[in-house]
Amino acid sequence: MASVKSRVFAITGGASGIGAATSRLLAERGATAVCVGDISCKNFDELKESMKKINPATEVHCSLLDVTSPTEVEKWVKSIVAKFGNLHGAANIAGIAQGAGLRNSPTILEEGDEEWSKVLKVNLDGVFYCTRAEVRAMKSLPSDDRSIVNVGSIAALSHIPDVYAYGTSKGASTYFTTCVAADTFPFGIRVNSVSPGITDTPLLPQFIPKAKTSDEVKEVYRKEGFSVVKAGDVARTIVWLLSEDSSPVYGANINVGASMP
């Protein structure tokens, strides 16, 4: 079992889906504190209550956070260190989807400027802002095993002739993560990526907008050769990378589920 006991973590996009599963698993494994930043406060109360039942000793702090704002991100990370005096690990999970099957071929001609900018702003710029703030905070703390995990996607590998912004954002995020890993490892900060396959989360239907039900979405992917994994499957990999058990792994990109159909 990956050890995260008595450690402090920051999770973006932590109020639902993979983020919530990661937050709950950290509590289950004995984390001292889990600090969640999310663009929506809708699930905060439910998350806090569920984590309290899992482990009353884990402190849970939920904050509204827009990862596209470097000012907000820096302030949020600083507030965690100010409150707990430490930051052992961070998982940058916040992201948005892009719907497939909505464009006529050649699909590149229908990839809009606004959508392109929006997706890259959250999925790439957000990862950059968060990683930078976390490295800044961790470097100023006493030497310890510290870990950052950025969540990518198999979309970065599958070369789909559609949803260009999403695939590009995830591919660039994974490349960025590998480069940062080489930069920060000498300072005791490990940085890695996790690239989930098709994952059963509230975000899943947004990838196939024409589907009428979640089951229909899953069936579309199954017919294309993809397995469907659960948020908890991805969370276990993230928590392992956040834990001391994964040391000295850095610069890795771990696929969860099929990397390619």
From Swiss-Prot:
Pathway: Alkaloid biosynthesis; ergot alkaloid biosynthesis. Pfam families: adh_short_C2. The active site is at residues 166, 170. Keywords: Alkaloid metabolism, NADP, Oxidoreductase, Signal. Its EC number is 1.1.1.-. One of its GO terms (biological process) is indole alkaloid biosynthetic process. It comes from the Eukaryota. The keyword Ribonucleoprotein does not apply. NADP(+) binds at residues 18, 48, 66, 132, 166, 170, 201. It is an enzyme of class 1 (oxidoreductase). Residues 1-20 form the signal peptide. The keyword NADP applies. InterPro entries: NAD(P)-bd_dom_sf (IPR036291), Sc_DH/Rdtase_CS (IPR020904), SDR_fam (IPR002347). GO terms for molecular function: oxidoreductase activity. Belongs to the short-chain dehydrogenases/reductases (SDR) family. Chanoclavine-I dehydrogenase; part of the gene cluster that mediates the biosynthesis of isofumigaclavines, fungal ergot alkaloids. The tryptophan dimethylallyltransferase ifgA catalyzes the first step of ergot alkaloid biosynthesis by condensing dimethylallyl diphosphate (DMAP) and tryptophan to form 4-dimethylallyl-L-tryptophan. The second step is catalyzed by the methyltransferase ifgB that methylates 4-dimethylallyl-L-tryptophan in the presence of S-adenosyl-L-methionine, resulting in the formation of N-methyl-dimethylallyl-L-tryptophan. This is Chanoclavine-I dehydrogenase ifgE. It comes from Penicillium roqueforti (strain FM164). The gene is ifgE.
